[in-house]
Design a protein with these regions (language model features):
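Generic, well-ordered alpha-helical scaffold segments in large soluble proteins
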Residues: 25, 179-183, 195, 235-239, ...
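Active-site-adjacent bridging/hinge elements
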Residues: 32-37, 208-214
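N-terminal glycine-rich phosphate/pyrophosphate-binding loop and immediately adjacent elements
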Residues: 2-142
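Helical element adjacent to the flavin cofactor pocket in flavoenzyme catalytic cores
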Residues: 213-260
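Generic recognition of stable, solvent-exposed alpha-helical segments in well-folded globular domains
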Residues: 17, 116, 171, 175, ...
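Acidic/polar loop patches that form or flank catalytic/metal-binding clefts of enzymes
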Residues: 73-75, 188-192, 242, 247-250
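Ligand-binding pocket scaffold of soluble enzyme catalytic domains
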Residues: 33, 85, 206, 246-247, ...
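Rossmann-like flavin
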Residues: 92-207
Length: 262
């Protein structure tokens, strides 16, 4: 019987990333997946003869660090720095289109407002970018490296300048609805930006709890996967297999038996 250091149940993108990192540490890893293919919501399925799609249609803000660490480009992952357009549809045909730092389909004053908004938000996002992949140190009895992490964050916030620093602390407490109301008057533009800000948060536009931070996290990204999500899954799977990970599909887990505290 084969011995494994780690058994991972499920073969979604998070599981495949974990399996790759464990394999890089010379661990013997088994991944078991109940479905016929890997990927979870990112798996490609045929919903009609000749037509395939995944539930997850795009993987934005996939960390560049993971791409480099796992050398996913060598396994077929292609990236582009171009931001895909986000379109707010209007029944009258006057659609609003967002693409990076540009917006069309709105009056000139709204275009100017969006430029100011995007410039400020991108500045905040870039300021926070180095910290998204770091573990927040516990408060109290911190080691020197942990104290330095707090000091670095504090310094980067202070370097924003007094006015922008105050605006940052005020803004991160706002619901997205209030933030949009402060900057814009065009209802479709506000709806489009509000929707974009709340992706993945399970929050509503008027929800508090720092939903603006999720928007800043997404704005800190610099790439989108150019093809569909299954392309990312395929690259992760190929990378894992090349590192010796044993991936078994059609393998449903019925029980987890724990014996002798191991």
């Amino acid at each position: 019987m084969a011995h494994y250091d780690t058994i991972i149940i499920g073969a979604g993108h998070n599981s495949l990333v974990c399996a790759n990192y464990l394999a890089l540490k010379k661990k013997n890893v088994l991944v078991v997946e109940a479905a016929e293919v890997c990927g979870g919501l990112g798996a490609r399925h045929e919903f009609h003869d000749g037509f395939h799609a995944s539930v997850a249609h795009q993987a934005s803000h996939f960390p560049q660090k993971i791409i480099r660490d796992l050398r996913l480009a060598e396994h077929g992952l292609s990236l582009s720095g171009d931001h895909k357009a986000c379109i707010g549809l209007n029944r009258d045909g006057d659609h609003v289109i967002l693409q990076g730092n540009k917006v069309s389909g709105v009056p000139d004053n709204e275009v100017d407002a969006y430029k100011r908004y995007h410039r400020l938000m991108k500045r905040y996002a870039d300021m926070l970018a180095p910290f998204w992949l770091k573990t927040v140190p516990p408060i109290g009895n911190n080691s020197l490296p942990e104290m330095m992490a707090f000091a670095e964050l504090g310094l980067r916030i202070r370097l924003l300048g007094k006015e922008d620093m105050r605006e940052f602390f005020r803004m991160i407490t706002l619901p997205v609805y209030d933030l949009m109301d402060e900057y814009f008057s065009h209802p479709l533009l506000k709806s489009l930006l509000g929707w974009d800000a709340l992706i993945g948060t399970k929050q509503a536009p008027r929800s508090p709890n720092n939903s603006v931070l999720q928007l800043l996290y997404r704005m800190a990204g610099d790439s989108h996967v150019t093809l569909d999500v299954p392309t990312l899954i395929d690259a992760l799977q190929r990378a894992a297999v090349s590192r010796g990970v044993d991936i078994r599909t059609n393998s449903r887990v019925c029980d987890i038996v724990v014996e002798q505290n191991s």
